[in-house]
Amino acid sequence: MLNTAANFTRTRIAPTPSGYLHVGNALSFALTAAIARKTGAKILLRIDDLDQHRVNPEYVQDIFDTLNFLAIPWDEGPRDAEDYKQNWSQLQRMDLYQDALQQLADQREVFTCRCSRSQLQGFSSYPGTCRNRSLPLDTPDTAWRLYTDDREMQLKTLNDAIITTRLPEAMKDFVVKKKDNYPAYQLASIVDDLHFGVDLIVRGDDLYPSTIAQLYLADVLGEDDFKKKTFYHHPLLMEDGDRKLSKSAGSTSIKYLRGQGMTAESVYAEIGKILTTKLPLQRFQDCEALL
């Protein structure tokens, strides 16, 4: 339930240009926009493009095509693909990410890990293979992981509840710098949210562990402002009842549906059917009823 007295400065829509956006993304964007307009928050468009080997110009353009098709507004950020490339790519904020990584190194909060994905297959959480090996931080082809413990954290929700929680086991010693030397999602996301002054973060239930990891990282970095932010985690749209939608599911992409002649109103209506809403959805403002 949305606190009707809530007021925020800024929220964000943060797609990744690694595939065509689908109806699950549309739901997240629409909810973000609905909450923003209800609470007076500006909407920042932030394109998360640090996974460079997966970035495709077609997917970047699809972000703008999808937002415009669905009439999802944004107040800040790139207006088109060229503006994004010239002024808003995360690559232009690398100094900010490097400063945070250097702080973690100076505080001795990170360790070097050379484990490959295949070596970690079958483990539900990081087994600590490299935790005590004291490998130099400048070892080539390695990642940096954060030393984590069992400390408590508090999460503020959209209805003003405070949840006391701990880092999920699956996020133990999570990665903050990848083997390609780019910052990992958890670090880049918190740095960006602090940099842009985002105080309301809307994301799917599947990213709840990431929220806890980011609150943990904020505590390590001494970023108390991040710990004051409000979070809303929304239900996911599921395929076949138990699998979340993915960008590889072409038939649910907005691009595909648009090509089949569906209108924006039809896409919203389809989302409403999947969620079995009492009232039909026709535009992003209608998603306020889902809160």
Which functions belong to the PLM regions below?
Residues 68, 99-109, 163-170, 280-291:
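A short, terminal or domain-edge coil/loop segment
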Residues 74-77, 225-231, 265, 278-284:
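Short, surface-exposed acidic
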Residues 79-85, 146, 222-227, 239-240, ...:
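Low-complexity, flexible helical/coil segments
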Residues 1-20, 38, 43, 141, ...:
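Non-catalytic terminal extensions that flank enzyme cores
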Residues 2-125, 206-225, 277:
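N-terminal Rossmann-like or analogous alpha/beta NTP/dinucleotide-binding catalytic cores
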Residues 48, 79, 116-117, 230-233, ...:
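Proline- and acidic/polar-enriched loop/turn elements at helix boundaries
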